[in-house]
Amino acid sequence: MATRTQARESVIGLLYAYDLGNDGITKFVDEILEEKKIRNNQKDFALNLFNGTIKNLSQIDENIVSNLNQGTLSDIGSVEKSILRLAIYEILFESLPKAIIINEAIELSKRLASDGAPKFINGLLDKIVKA
């Protein structure tokens, strides 16, 4: 059975595809999660995260932009942006402890993103939590 970390990783992949302009990905979310063996409770968890992030994307992106020290949303890599979007959705709309959400985002960024991403993601999420 898949873990929540694996479910989040799948959601990041879906958000990444969505960010690259594949709006049609929303039609295939169920099949993609099934292919990655994300099932039952974890599938419900992943669907909630993906759909919630997409539904609240404008508000999430506003949070990112307003907490950047410099640059714009388009300056952030797609993987890093996907990790941030998911984490910010969880911070704003889910009831998990903020420290767990931030730690999970940092760990996922170590595996999926560029070398400087964990520090950048940690700093930005920390600012958002403290705002």
From Swiss-Prot:
Enumerate the Pfam families for this protein: NusB
Query: Which SUPFAM superfamilies does this one have?
Result: NusB-like
Gene Ontology terms for molecular function: RNA binding
Cellular component terms, GO, for this chain's entry? cytosol
The biological processes this protein is annotated with in GO are: DNA-templated transcription termination; transcription antitermination
Asked if the keyword RNA-binding belongs to this entry, the reply reads yes
InterPro entries, per this entry? NusB-like_sf (IPR035926), NusB_fam (IPR011605), NusB_RsmB_TIM44 (IPR006027)
Entry keyword set: RNA-binding, Transcription, Transcription antitermination, Transcription regulation
What is this protein for, i.e. what is its function? Involved in transcription antitermination. Required for transcription of ribosomal RNA (rRNA) genes. Binds specifically to the boxA antiterminator sequence of the ribosomal RNA (rrn) operons.
Membership in a protein family: Belongs to the NusB family.
Q: What protein name applies here?
A: Transcription antitermination protein NusB
Highest lineage ranks of the organism?
Answer: Bacteria, Pseudomonadati, Campylobacterota, Epsilonproteobacteria, Campylobacterales
